Amino acid sequence: GLERAEAARLKGRLRAWDSIVVPRWAGVPEAHCAQLGYFCLQLPAMQAAPDQPVASREAQLSDTRLFRQFNAFLLPGDQDGSPTWNNLLADLRALILRARPEVIVLPHPSIDPHPDHICAQAAVFEALQGLEWQPTTILGYANHLHDNDRWPMGNSADGIALPPVFDASLSLYPCSVLLSLD
């Protein structure tokens, strides 16, 4: 097997590759995709000290550019590759202005407790502050649940139950989009 740091770098490179290849299966051109390359479980530390670089825990790296090699365009964080909250915000602002999305879909912190997902949502909201482009709709979803890491459960092509509501004070509305084979 690989050494731990080498395995972590390989996993990151595979994720970068997936971020380009998987959308292509759906007909999304590479020029519309970007990999940010920030490190797993480091977003809370980045948020706590916005101008301080936060290196990878596993990959022995402190430069995000290794994982951006497939990007078709440069982002602000590519200037120094520093994994900081401020670079993340600058990257998000650049992507939002480039894509001008009408809809943004994010993990919802009330139903997805993963610390990186919570911080990613906070980063998008912070990046949107004062930005000349604003989406018309923001949707939330759960990738991880509070009590387990196995949701959504079930067989491929089966229906998926809605995630449980953990905070009754929130107004969460289900959204289901019908897909065709085309």
Give the positions of each predicted feature.
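Metal-dependent de-N-acetylase/amidase catalytic core
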Residues: 2-18, 25-30, 35, 39-182
